[in-house]
Amino acid sequence: METVISFTAIAVAIMIGLAALGTGIGFAILGGKFLEASARQPELAPALQTKMFIVAGLLDAISMIAVGVALFFVFANPFLGQLAG
């Protein structure tokens, strides 16, 4: 049982870490491309900014889903029920 708990803790750490890494890389690429596009065509900056914030919200949602799944595994681990039963 301790093995399942330790592997779950490692999996949760990997999930949260990769979600944070992916979100950080995504925001960096998104911000860089937004600044590049705004520098090329400044008149499109307001429209691009709206689209950038929508995509930023989707990027942030992906990491929040990963945190939710990780918290599910921490507090309501479904694998422990299979060991007990």
Swiss-Prot record:
Statement: the UniProt record of this protein carries the keyword Ion transport: yes
Record-linked Gene3D superfamilies: F1F0 ATP synthase subunit C (1.20.20.10)
Subcellular location: Cell inner membrane
Membrane topology listed for this record: Multi-pass membrane protein
Pfam families in the cross-refs: ATP-synt_C
Keyword Repeat among UniProt keywords: no
Superkingdom of origin organism: Bacteria
Ranges annotated as spanning the membrane: 10-30, 53-73
Similarity comment text for this entry: Belongs to the ATPase C chain family.
NCBIfam families, per the entry: ATP_synt_c, PRK06876.1
Function: F(1)F(0) ATP synthase produces ATP from ADP in the presence of a proton or sodium gradient. F-type ATPases consist of two structural domains, F(1) containing the extramembraneous catalytic core and F(0) containing the membrane proton channel, linked together by a central stalk and a peripheral stalk. During catalysis, ATP synthesis in the catalytic domain of F(1) is coupled via a rotary mechanism of the central stalk subunits to proton translocation.
Designated name of the protein: ATP synthase subunit c
Organism of origin: Shewanella pealeana (strain ATCC 700345 / ANG-SQ1)
